[in-house]
Amino acid sequence: MSYYFKNLKPDLNSDVEEDDGNLLESIMANKSKREIDEQESSDDELKTLSFGSLKKAETIIDEEDFKDTKPVHKKPITTTYREESFDEDDDSEDKSDEDAGFFEEDSEDETHHGQKVPKKKSKHAPIEQSSKKRVPRVRNIPGLEIPRNKRSNLYQDIRFDKSTGKALDSSIIRKRYQFLDEYREKEIDELQKLLQDRKFLSKIDQGEREEMEQRLKSMKSRLQSMKNKDLEREILKEYENDMNKNNNTRYHLKKSEKRKVVQKWKFDHMKAKQREKVMERKRKKRLGKEFKQFEFHNRR
């Protein structure tokens, strides 16, 4: 109660009652005036606010609502079991114990229904799977996985697949499909003619032209690398045949020896200018190695 109501005392005089009524009316009028003034002041404050501050207030309210509605992660219920005594004279069990045992059984059924994955006994142990689980039609068989550098290919030729059980000998495959070089050369010639045709170039964009040039370059380099491998194969075959003419047991070269034989054959069949370039390149390489071994390079 307010201060005025505390000081009021009951009296028989009517003048006192009139004064009390006037006081009440004045108090109510002052209260209504204050409320009107507060509403007007709040409206004026809202008018002066900028859109940026209103937006910030809205985002803060949204964040608080999101925090309030965030899901709470419940911890898994762990049940503990106790040994029960079956003595007839033991009457110490209460109803609370019976209820606890009842709820423990329910929780056990719930965990069984959730089908938790059994943990391994050790990290080296094999993974245990249920025999009731259906086996998928497509499975990853060890030894037949596609390497990462070949996964980007859209199509795969089943003739060269490991699942056939045959060893992939690149020389045999190259002999079988060597006739494809003619088609590759024809494609290269056609692309070169198109890139030299001015009418055709005027009809296409700059991006399409660059793409065609890149394709032509890659086709040429691929064909040249195939031919270089064929040449190296022939060189090594001739060298091994000459070496094993009078030998009862056939001798095969190591990788390092094969590389030396191929380099020697290429150097012998080079022209004079090409030899000079190769010798100059080797000389610069040797000088660079010697320069790195100087004493001032080892200082810190």
Curated annotation (Swiss-Prot):
Keywords for this protein: Coiled coil, Nucleus, Phosphoprotein, Ribonucleoprotein, Ribosome biogenesis, rRNA processing
GO terms classed as biological process: maturation of SSU-rRNA from tricistronic rRNA transcript (SSU-rRNA, 5.8S rRNA, LSU-rRNA)
Sites bearing Phosphoserine, chain numbering: 14, 41-42
Main location: nucleus
One GO CC term, this protein: nucleolus
Basic residues bias: start-end ranges: 114-124
Residue ranges with Acidic residues bias: 85-109
Subcellular location: Nucleus, Nucleolus
Region annotation Disordered: where it falls in the sequence: 60-146
Superkingdom of the organism of origin: Eukaryota
InterPro entries per the UniProt record, alphabetical: RRP36
Coiled-coil segments on the chain, per record: 203-248
Subunit (UniProt): Associates with 90S and pre-40S pre-ribosomal particles. Interacts with CKA1, CKA2, CKB1, CKB2, PWP2, UTP15, UTP17 and UTP22.
Role: Component of the 90S pre-ribosome involved in the maturation of rRNAs. Required for early cleavages of the pre-RNAs in the 40S ribosomal subunit maturation pathway.
Family per record: Belongs to the RRP36 family.
The protein's name: rRNA biogenesis protein RRP36
Gene designation per UniProt: RRP36
